[in-house]
């Protein structure tokens, strides 16, 4: 369900989010694929009749994360990051993050965010502000380890 809007083009995601879902940031407008979570949450509510706000938030933020995530949001975020059939190149740390996720979900989220930001920087891509804010929350917790 988290990826129910993933097949849409970037242009369609932006147009549909402008029309139906939450406001679209400039980074999201330039990187429409980021919106499949927001639009997916809208469809989960309107097409699949999901009313649980935690589930809807988990769908909405499964790509970017968000500060103050619940355990369910963390689990869905990590499930998306760790799925075995991702198109994005995997990192050498992926198996280690999978292992850590079973004992320390917060640390696994931190490492996933750290790897995501490194990948975006190295590939010259923009970082969504919500992802940056989420990383900062976890960095403050784990930077001295």
Label every PLM stretch briefly:
Residues 118-145:
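Charged phosphate-binding loop/patch that engages nucleotide di/tri-phosphates or the phosphate backbone
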Residues 1-111:
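Divalent metal-dependent catalytic cores for phosphoryl transfer on phosphate-bearing substrates
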Residues 112-116:
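C-terminal beta-signal and terminal closure region of outer-membrane beta-barrel proteins
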